[in-house]
From Swiss-Prot:
This is Histone H2A.Z. Keywords: Acetylation, Chromosome, DNA-binding, Nucleosome core, Nucleus. One of its GO terms (biological process) is regulation of transcription by RNA polymerase II. InterPro entries: Histone-fold (IPR009072), Histone_H2A (IPR002119), Histone_H2A/H2B/H3 (IPR007125), Histone_H2A_C (IPR032454).
Length: 138
């Protein structure tokens, strides 16, 4: 039936495969949990002169953010587990970040309510040890 009102052959309108497909987000395609679309929007809004941002760039930045977050949370969870508590607090985040040399150089920010790392100067330790030895000898 050329030219008449018949069933269309080929094309997107008549294919049954397109109707059965579900939409997948960029995050799902990349196997990520963090939202690629939101990261892309932030990248576009925060660049000078509203520069263009490629889809792959947004996926890459999202993957890096997700990896760093997982790394910090794993170390903070270990710190909380060592202290025998079930909730991660800013103190655990501080201990985790300052305990890892690479994360410490990357994250130089001050963490609110994180406290400080326990550290005693060696010179002070030597004086205390010498006093203990003098008392035990006398």
């Amino acid at each position: 039936m050329p030219g008449g009102k018949g069933k269309s052959v080929g094309g997107k309108a008549g294919s049954k495969d397109a109707a059965g497909k579900t939409q997948k987000s960029h995050s799902a395609k990349a196997g990520l949990q963090f939202p690629c679309g939101r990261v892309k929007r932030f990248l576009k809004n925060n660049t000078q002169n509203k520069m263009r941002v490629g889809a792959k760039a947004a996926v890459y930045v999202t993957a890096v953010l997700e990896y760093l977050t997982a790394e910090v949370l794993e170390l903070a969870g270990n710190a909380a587990k060592d202290l025998k508590v079930k909730r991660i607090t800013p103190r655990h985040l501080q201990l985790a970040i300052r305990g890892d040399e690479e994360l410490d150089t990357l994250i130089r920010a001050t963490i609110a309510f994180g406290g400080v790392l326990p550290r005693i100067n060696r010179a002070l330790l030597l004086k205390v040890e010498q006093k203990k030895k003098n008392k035990s000898e006398a």
